[in-house]
Amino acid sequence: MMASLRHSITSALRSSRQGCSKSAQWQSLDQQFGALRISSRSLSTHAHDHNPNVDGQFIAAPALSIDNFKLHPYARAVPVSPSYFTRTPRFYDNYLSLEKLMEEYEDLPVIPATAVERVAWKTLEDIRKELGEQVKASEFARCLALVKRLNSIHPDLKPQEIKDVLDSFRRNVQPFTNVAKPIPIDQFGRACGVGKRKASSARAFVVEGTGEVLVNGKTLAEYFGRVHDRESAVWALRATNRIDKYNVWVKVEGGGTTGQAEAITLAIAKALLAHEPALKPALRRAGCVTRDPRKVERKKHGHVKARKMPTWVKR
């Protein structure tokens, strides 16, 4: 009897204790969830005190300052150029830009090679001096091939960005656009031409006449003793059948008779073109308008002449 009474009292006390602990536990959980309750307005950077549904005061977070942001000491700096780790980064940047333009405008029509404008592109030495990098010849050749391919695009369809890139590869001086000034004819009907050969230089004044030729105030027969030199001096007139239609007065100096005669040929041809420009193809075929750049080769020490060596004797 006493045992059963003791057991009932013990079970009653145990149940009351568990009820108290569970109620306290649920009360603490309610407080924690209340503290963690987050509304959509609490995520805003502005406080909404006028809203009665929000309990308590909300203060906006301070603004972030990028100036005061400190970089991590072990952070890796990103290179400015994708070609930073190459041997010639500036050159490869230009090369990649050309490849990008080529991929974008590859389908544009091109003109024949004979119709493409002649342009003097920068040389390998110019690129090396401009970029300050030791560019390889093979790499520069590939780059120049892309430049010429872009330059062959039809001028009416060529975009402005391609023109800007091509201008950066052009030389400052374009020799193909330099045109020689035409020789004027003075008030007396004279045209003055200048010619050079070896160490000789000649100035020829050509005027319409009957075919008289004076060299330093003398006739051809008096000035040149050799028939070959006489024929060479007036070869420009004889090749165009104008030997009896113009009078020529020549001032020549320097060199020998052969050099003076060929210098006179070039001078007369240039002056004749001032009177009749249509004769240029005939004079070119006759070899009268192209200057001969050959000069006497100098003598070397140990040689008898420029090339000749002394006779070798075995003993």
UniProtKB/Swiss-Prot annotation:
PROSITE patterns, per the entry: RIBOSOMAL_S9
Pfam family, one: Ribosomal_S9
Family from the record: Belongs to the universal ribosomal protein uS9 family.
The organism of origin for this protein: Neurospora crassa (strain ATCC 24698 / 74-OR23-1A / CBS 708.71 / DSM 1257 / FGSC 987)
Subunit structure: Component of the mitochondrial small ribosomal subunit (mt-SSU). Mature N.crassa 74S mitochondrial ribosomes consist of a small (37S) and a large (54S) subunit. The 37S small subunit contains a 16S ribosomal RNA (16S mt-rRNA) and 32 different proteins. The 54S large subunit contains a 23S rRNA (23S mt-rRNA) and 42 different proteins.
Places the protein is found: Mitochondrion
InterPro entries the UniProt entry points to: Ribosomal_Su5_D2-typ_SF, Ribosomal_uS9, Ribosomal_uS9_bac/plastid, Ribosomal_uS9_CS, Ribsml_uS5_D2-typ_fold_subgr
Protein name: Small ribosomal subunit protein uS9m
Gene (UniProt): mrp-9
Primary localization class, coarse: mitochondrion
Keywords: Mitochondrion, Ribonucleoprotein, Ribosomal protein, Transit peptide
Stretches for region Disordered: 293-315
Start-end of Basic residues biased regions: 296-315
Sections of the chain in a coiled coil: none
One cellular component (GO) term of this entry: mitochondrial small ribosomal subunit
Keyword presence, Ribosomal protein: yes
GO biological process terms held by the UniProt record: translation
Transit peptide: 1-42
Functional note: Component of the mitochondrial ribosome (mitoribosome), a dedicated translation machinery responsible for the synthesis of mitochondrial genome-encoded proteins, including at least some of the essential transmembrane subunits of the mitochondrial respiratory chain. The mitoribosomes are attached to the mitochondrial inner membrane and translation products are cotranslationally integrated into the membrane.
UniProt-recorded Gene Ontology molecular function terms: RNA binding; structural constituent of ribosome
